[in-house]
C-alpha cells in the first residue's frame, strides 16, 4: 500500500512580497508534490482564518506558526495514511483543527497540505491533476474573466470598483479566447498611454489609471475591444467585480469616494441597471455588501434574469452559507476560492451544491498569488466553466493560463462554453 511518508512546510513568498505557506507531501513510492497557498486583499468576514504570526517579522505577516502546525500536528496525524482518500484526509484535517474556520491550525496550513496530498496522489498514479480530481468527465475549459483595469483595494487609484474584466465568449476554444484577450489588453495599454494615463499595473496585472468615474473604465475597455477588431458583446463581453463590502459604511450605505456620492442599496442597484442597459455587461460580482442580504434579494429580483450575479464575500466558498442563499433566492452564481474554506474536499462540496441548484461557478485566484497553478486543473476537474485569474500580465497569473493551454492540448475532446454560458 502506498502511504504518506513525509509532510513538510516552509515559508515562501507570494506575488505581493508577503510570506505564505508551501507544503510538500512525499509518498512511500518516492513521489513528491508541493502546493503554495494564495492570499486575498479584500476578504469576506466569514472566510476561513489565515494564520499569521503577528510579530515583528514581515510586519506581522509571517507564517512560521502555520508551517509549524503542518510540520508537527498535521504531519503526525497524516503520515502513514493513503493519499488516495482525499475526503478522509481533509476530514482528519478539519477534525484536528476542531473549529469551523480553521482558527487553530490556520486555513493556510490546512489548504497547503490538502492540495499537496491531491497532487502527490495524481503524480503517483501518473495522471494529470484535473483527471485525478474530476475523472473522465473533466472536459470543460473555462471561459476566462480577465481583470484588465484594477481599482478598489487592488490598486492605488480613484476608481471604486475593484475589477473591470473582459470575457471572451465568441470563440471556439480556450486558446483563441486567450489570444483575443491578450490583443485587447495590448490595445488598452496603448489607449491609456496615448491619453497620458499611467500604465502601471495592480495586484492582478490589470492597469490602474486614475479615472474620473467608475463608468470611464468601461468606456475605455470597449474602445480597446473595438481597436483589437472585436465586437463588444458579441465576441467579448464585460464583467465587474464591484467588491462593494469594501466601500459600505456603518449605516449600510455605499460611498463611492472616487465620484463623491453615497448611495442606498436600491440606488446602487439602479446604477447597475443603467450600466447594463448601456454596455454589454454579463456578470457582476459582489454587487452589494456581504451583510446586505435584503439588498441582495432586491438585486437578484431586479437583475438576476439579465446578468450573472456572483457571490464572493457573500458566500466565501462555504456550502452552509451558499445553502442559505439558495433557500432565499439570492444571487445566481458563486466564486470559488479554495482558501476561503480550507480544503480541497470542502471546495468540491460547495461546487457540487451550486451545480445541483443551477448556480454557476467561477474558479478564482487571489490577489496574492504564486506560480502554483492548482486552480487551473481544479476548474477543469469540476467543469466550472469560468475562471478568474487576472490579466495577461504578471507571471503568477500567466502560470494558470499556460497550464490551461497545456490541458487543452492534452485533451482529445474538450468543450469551451463561450456564448452558451449566457
From Swiss-Prot:
Its GO biological process terms?
Answer: glycolytic process
Has UniProt tagged this entry with the keyword Ubl conjugation?
A: no
GO cellular component annotations of the record: cell surface; extracellular region; phosphopyruvate hydratase complex
The GO molecular function terms of this record are: magnesium ion binding; phosphopyruvate hydratase activity
Primary location recorded for the protein, binned into one broad class? cytoplasm
Q: In which pathway does it act?
A: Carbohydrate degradation; glycolysis; pyruvate from D-glyceraldehyde 3-phosphate: step 4/5
Q: Where is it located?
A: Cytoplasm; Secreted; Cell surface
Catalytic residues of the enzyme? 204, 337
**How is the cofactor bound, as the UniProt entry phrases it?**
Binds a second Mg(2+) ion via substrate during catalysis.
Q: Which reaction does it catalyse?
A: (2R)-2-phosphoglycerate = phosphoenolpyruvate + H2O
Q: Where does Mg(2+) bind?
A: 241, 285, 312
Q: Which residues bind (2R)-2-phosphoglycerate?
A: 162, 337, 366-367, 388
Q: Please tell me whether the keyword Magnesium is annotated for this protein.
A: yes
Q: What class of enzyme is it?
A: lyase
Q: What NCBIfam families does the database record attribute to this sequence?
A: eno
Q: What is the protein name given in its UniProt record?
A: Enolase
Amino acid at each position: 500500500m502506498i502511504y504518506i511518508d513525509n509532510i513538510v512546510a516552509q515559508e515562501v513568498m507570494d506575488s505581493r512580497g508577503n510570506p505564505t505557506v508551501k507544503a510538500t507531501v512525499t509518498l512511500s513510492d518516492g513521489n513528491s508534490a508541493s502546493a503554495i497557498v494564495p492570499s486575498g486583499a479584500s476578504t469576506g468576514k466569514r472566510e476561513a482564518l489565515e494564520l499569521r504570526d503577528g510579530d515583528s517579522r514581515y510586519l506581522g505577516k509571517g507564517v512560521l506558526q502555520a508551517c509549524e502546525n503542518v510540520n508537527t500536528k498535521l504531519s503526525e496525524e497524516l503520515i502513514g495514511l493513503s493519499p488516495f482518500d482525499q475526503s478522509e484526509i481533509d476530514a482528519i484535517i478539519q477534525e484536528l483543527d476542531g473549529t469551523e474556520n480553521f482558527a487553530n491550525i490556520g486555513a493556510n496550513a490546512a489548504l497547503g497540505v490538502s492540495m499537496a496530498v491531491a497532487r502527490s496522489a495524481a503524480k503517483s498514479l501518473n495522471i494529470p491533476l484535473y483527471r485525478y480530481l474530476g475523472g473522465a468527465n473533466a472536459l470543460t475549459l473555462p471561459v476566462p474573466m480577465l481583470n484588465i483595469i484594477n481599482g478598489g483595494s487592488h490598486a492605488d487609484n480613484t476608481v471604486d470598483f475593484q475589477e473591470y474584466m473582459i470575457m471572451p465568449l465568441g470563440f471556439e476554444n480556450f486558446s483563441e479566447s486567450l489570444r483575443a484577450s491578450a490583443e485587447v489588453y495590448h490595445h488598452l495599454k496603448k489607449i491609456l498611454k496615448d491619453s497620458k494615463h499611467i500604465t502601471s499595473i495592480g495586484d492582478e496585472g490589470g492597469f490602474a489609471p486614475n479615472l474620473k468615474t467608475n463608468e470611464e473604465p468601461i468606456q475605455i475597455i470597449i474602445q480597446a475591444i473595438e481597436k483589437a477588431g472585436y465586437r463588444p458583446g458579441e465576441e467579448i463581453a464585460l464583467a465587474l467585480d464591484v467588491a462593494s463590502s469594501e466601500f459600505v459604511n456603518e449605516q449600510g450605505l455605499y460611498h463611492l469616494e472616487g465620484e463623491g456620492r453615497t448611495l442606498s442599496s436600491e440606488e446602487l442597484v439602479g446604477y447597475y441597471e443603467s450600466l447594463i442597459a448601456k454596455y454589454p455587461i454579463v456578470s457582476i460580482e459582489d454587487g452589494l455588501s456581504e451583510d446586505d442580504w435584503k439588498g441582495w434579494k432586491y438585486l437578484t429580483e431586479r437583475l438576476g434574469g439579465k446578468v450573472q450575479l456572483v457571490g464572493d464575500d457573500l458566500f466565501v466558498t462555504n456550502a452552509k452559507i451558499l445553502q442559505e442563499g439558495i433557500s432565499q433566492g439570492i444571487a445566481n452564481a458563486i466564486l470559488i476560492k479554495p482558501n476561503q474554506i480550507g480544503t480541497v474536499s470542502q471546495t468540491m462540496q460547495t461546487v457540487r451544491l451550486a451545480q445541483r441548484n443551477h448556480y454557476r461557478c467561477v474558479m478564482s485566484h487571489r490577489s496574492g498569488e504564486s506560480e502554483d497553478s492548482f486552480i487551473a486543473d481544479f476548474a477543469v476537474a469540476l467543469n466550472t466553466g469560468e475562471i478568474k485569474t487576472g490579466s495577461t500580465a504578471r507571471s503568477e497569473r500567466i502560470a494558470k493560463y499556460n497550464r490551461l493551454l497545456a490541458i487543452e492540448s492534452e485533451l482529445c475532446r474538450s468543450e469551451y462554453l463561450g456564448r452558451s454560458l449566457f
